[in-house]
A protein has these predicted regions:
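Helical hinge/lid and interdomain linker segments adjacent to catalytic or ligand-binding clefts
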Residues: 26-123, 127-131
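Catalytic beta-strand/loop cores that center a nucleophilic Ser/Cys/Thr
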Residues: 52, 58, 159-245
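Active-site rim elements
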Residues: 34-37, 125, 166-171, 176-181, ...
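Extracytoplasmic/secreted proteins, especially bacterial periplasmic and envelope-associated proteins
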Residues: 42, 46, 84, 106, ...
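Bacterial N-terminal signal peptides
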Residues: 5-16
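Extracellular ligand-binding/catalytic regions of CAZymes and related secreted enzymes
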Residues: 21-27, 42-43, 53, 80, ...
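Short, solvent-exposed loop/turn segments at secondary-structure junctions
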Residues: 36-37, 94-95, 128-130, 198, ...
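A glycine-rich, often tryptophan-bearing local segment used as a flexible ligand/cofactor-contacting loop or short
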Residues: 94-191
Length: 303
């Protein structure tokens, strides 16, 4: 039986959700968008609202040229000031093919320097599809929508040990239809996942399998059982890059004209808020909401 609890109304949310009180020195966030195979415009609005509603962040948005055939002159006008922000939330996916859209090299270098010098990054869902030919980006994401020849893959066995599948072996990336599934916390001691139940339900998500990449320095926080390939797939992980911290979540699927069910999940919202704070500061002080999902019950919140 699919159990769903939906929290409605501002008063109910404030009482039941466990929102942190607004903080005086808010964390500065830049969301980058402009291209994605998902509904990035609606997704950015929802990500921004989730972060701002926590009372912990100020959020700006920087949008790239939205046309894959954009001219050099159009791209020359896009020069985000990453250094102005404590953390960048990446909602951009210009395509997984090596020939797909890259950022101008000047911007890529600025982003690399930003993270190397201590800037935080949050990669949301399809953001790890992008930039197959950008080596530094691949180091930041660890795993992405890359084929078996690109690099190793990681799965979690039934003893909760991370298993490396060598380059050239295993599966190419893919996913089945969106469905409800159970998330499992692998590291309950990390600030992002602290206090979460060992298992909790997440709704109507796209569960990706067979991702490949450098897979270096990855610390996996959560995983989920893929019924499509009968393996445990990493869902959330963190990677150090220089002095910076990168948090990747595979949650947050939002298709064009599709429901925003995944982003209304209290579990997703908690991961996003905590992951963004952690990427920026190395801490996660956002309390576990009282309406957090359980092992058997999905919990959703209006945004």
């Amino acid at each position: 039986m699919r159990l769903i609890a939906i929290v409605l109304g501002l008063t109910t949310v404030l009482i039941n959700s466990g929102f942190a009180a607004p903080v005086q020195n808010k964390i500065s966030v830049l969301i980058v968008d402009g291209m994605n195979n998902h509904d990035w415009e609606r997704g950015t609005k929802l990500l921004k609202a989730i972060l701002e509603n926590s009372g912990m962040f100020t959020v700006d948005v920087s949008t790239t040229p939205t046309n894959k055939d954009a001219s050099a002159e159009q791209w020359a006008k896009w020069r985000p000031n990453f250094a102005k922000y404590q953390v960048v939330v990446n909602n951009y996916n210009g395509g997984y093919k090596p020939t797909d859209t890259r950022w101008p090299r000047e911007v890529e270098k600025a982003f690399e320097d930003y993270v190397t010098n201590g800037g935080g990054v949050v990669m949301v869902h399809a953001a790890n599809n992008a930039f197959a030919n950008w080596p530094a980006y691949n180091e930041m994401i660890g795993l992405g929508w890359r084929n078996t020849n690109f690099g190793p893959s990681l799965i979690i066995n039934d003893k909760e040990k991370v298993v490396t599948i060598p380059q050239g072996e295993g599966r190419n990336p893919g996913h089945g239809k969106e469905h409800d599934f159970q998330m499992t916390v692998l590291d309950a001691n990390h600030p992002i996942t602290a206090g979460m139940p060992k298992k909790w339900m997440h709704p109507m998500e796209q569960l990706t399998h067979g991702q490949h990449g450098p897979a270096k320095n990855m610390h996996i926080l959560t995983y989920a059982w893929s019924k499509d390939v009968n393996e445990n797939e990493p869902m959330d992980w963190v990677i150090p890059y220089g002095k910076g911290r990168v948090y990747t979540t595979m949650l947050g699927h939002l298709w064009h004209d599709g429901p925003d069910t995944t982003m209304r999940c209290v579990g997703f919202q908690t991961l996003l808020i905590r992951g963004t704070e952690w990427a920026a500061t190395g801490r996660a002080t956002y309390p576990l909401p009282k309406d957090f999902p359980t092992e058997t019950e999905i919990r959703m919140r209006e945004i």
